Amino acid sequence: MFNEITKSVIWNRQVLEISTGKIARQADAAVTVKMGNSILLCTCVVANKVKDGIGFFPLTINYREMAYSAGKIPGGFLKREGKASDKEILVSRLIDRPIRPLFHQAFIHETHITCSVLSYDPETPVDILAIIGASAALSISPAPYLEIVAASKVGLINGEFVLNPTLELLKTSQLDLVVAGTKDSVMMVESEAHLLSEEKMLEAIKFGFENFQTVIKLIKEFAKEAKKPKFEMQDLYPSSLKKEIGKLFAKEIEQAFAIKSKQERNANLALIHEKVLTHFVCDIENKKYNNYQIESTLKAISADILRNKILEQNIRIDGRSTTDIRQIACEVGLLPSAHGSALFTRGETQSLVSTTFGTSLDEQIVDSLEGEYKERFMLNYIFPPYSVNEAMPMKAPSRREVGHGKLAWRAINPILPNKVQFPYSIRVVAETTESNGSSSMATVCGSSLALMYAGVPIKAPVAGIAMGLIKEGDKFAILSDIIGDEDYFGDMDFKVAGTSKGITALQMDIKISGIDFKIIQVALEQARHGRLHILEQMNKIISKPNSELSKNAPSSTTIKIDKDKIKDIIGPGGKIIKEICETSNAKIDISDDGTVSVYAADRDKIKVALDKIKAIAVEPEIGEIFNGTVMKVLDSGAFINYLGNKDGFVHISEISETRIDKVSSVLKQGDIVKVKLIGFDNKGKAKLTIKNACKDHSLNNPKQKNNVKEDSEPEQRRDASKKRTWNEDNNTEMSEVITERKYFT
């Protein structure tokens, strides 16, 4: 019944198996990939006809994680898989990036690739298997796929590179890198790193590249037996068409590229585009040429003009040399109600970034195949249409926004303090208010500024830069800080973020058939110089975290209690902890190890909550001194309330060093006194003393009795309205206003 074809190889001490012919046989191509207990189904479906009027290659890639693959039922009200999670979107993009450039340029049939996780094994990297499966499916599909792609994951543990590390190993790794490519060149790199040098990063890329060659050989052998006939493709750029467009419009295109302003330049290029389509309208109607051929040929001619000027004259669109960085302007503290804010502007690209602190209750809960976990640091990248002057509605976050946000997250995450050093959850929102290339790297720079201004004790400032490539034969030029057109007409988008000490994130996408390691090495070194220049400009406005938090940030404190007391604080059905939160207006988080974190808007609210918690959880010890309130006065002494709900008795002889005839002459109901626990009677009632608690304490001074000091004075807190700006043009600090406020930690 089944005509199954299976190939396997030992890869990194595990069996990697790919097969076809058993599942999803009606799809143009369907491949099952297996490693360990992980099984993925990767399918490829290609439309038979091209849609009329289409002017691009409609490739859609979807990666899906089925809950049953990990023996789980989906959470939420509807117990089924819904919209794609962030991880599914990120892996979909990871598959897309090395594959898209390798289709024939003239191929515009709608193509859908779906990779579904059917069985999940945490010991194997399913994202890598998805790339391998998609490549294998394309290799046996009718789509004109020019090269076979494979991928590998690389970790760095104890100074040694590790191939395809497990999730557990990645927790201790200095590097989490995915590299994909063909047998001859690298196509895509994605990584998060803990301050790795450029040399070490290049070594890691080489290590990953060398180790996936085994998989490329496996897919080639598999495709020989299982492949189907490919679509026959025509020349995308008919020579007659290219000659005619060049003759009529090349001069106008060259003049348009001489305009430095993005808006004016784009307006001129759009006008030329309309002229070209109008000129060839009859040829389109007669089906001599199609829209895609005309638009692609126009793009190719435009690219040739731009690229030749860079390669031959070392001059870019905006007049910069290949290594020049656009002008930079920085400003912090411009949003007075935010906990931290910054505006980072580089040329015509601008990012407005805000930082907000929350409690552990505000952490993002993530439900994944590995299980449920929390993300303490959240970074949201927003790309509104107005940033590129487009009249479009605001929609839910796009795949691009999710991807750019995750890249910026990877750049910032390695330099954040741990939860012990900084107990807050952190949300960064980066809104791209202007865009002309490299907006994700502007997000990194703006996020670093906003975090430092907010007072987050990051390890070092971080900056990011996007590099480009123009390559013709053996001749190439690496471009620093690319703009939109250089990205669009160029051969590479290479983004590097890091501190002055090393790289924290790297992302590389190639638009040609691949590049060699010499180009990567040059790009990394040129990016390092650019990154240091950007950091220098950022440091002129703020070079280290503020020592104080914003007055708008929540106060917090943490105490440790006996684990056996947790149930007492929570109470039946959460009754006690709810009552504490309601009466104090504080948020309380209790960990299983007995760590209690209290968050509130000010110190007084925290104190109310802490007093109630201590009253329940803290057992007083003999010799301890407390603040107490006189509840009732008797002839023989007085009853004192201390630690919230605990009562004790002070005998008349323990009130003062001098003889007292009447207790009421010294103590009155409601008086605040210091008391010391000296023991318990035979019924377990606390015995207290006043005279030994504070011998120089004047009971007759009402101010002293009602103004008991806390054990520690509150520190200073910064006013968020403190504002600093830096503009590279005039090298002046424009304004600085400081207001102080007390807070409690």
From Swiss-Prot:
Enzyme Commission designation: 2.7.7.8
Sequence ranges of Basic and acidic residues compositional bias: 707-719
Pfam families membership: KH_1, PNPase, RNase_PH, RNase_PH_C, S1
The reaction(s) this protein catalyses: RNA(n+1) + phosphate = RNA(n) + a ribonucleoside 5'-diphosphate
Domain KH: 554-613
Record carries keyword rRNA-binding: no
GO cellular component, one term: cytosol
Gene Ontology molecular function: any one: 3'-5'-RNA exonuclease activity
Enzyme class: transferase
GO biological process, alphabetically ordered: mRNA catabolic process; RNA processing
Domain S1 motif: 623-691
Cofactor(s) listed in the protein's UniProt record: Mg(2+)
Binding site for Mg(2+): 487, 493
Entry-linked Gene3D superfamilies: GHMP Kinase, N-terminal domain, K Homology domain, type 1, Nucleic acid-binding proteins
Places the protein is found: Cytoplasm
Region called Disordered, residue ranges: 695-745
Keyword annotations from UniProtKB, A to Z: Cytoplasm, Magnesium, Metal-binding, Nucleotidyltransferase, RNA-binding, Transferase
Job description of the protein: Involved in mRNA degradation. Catalyzes the phosphorolysis of single-stranded polyribonucleotides processively in the 3'- to 5'-direction.
Record-stated family: Belongs to the polyribonucleotide nucleotidyltransferase family.
Protein name: Polyribonucleotide nucleotidyltransferase
Organism: Rickettsia typhi (strain ATCC VR-144 / Wilmington)
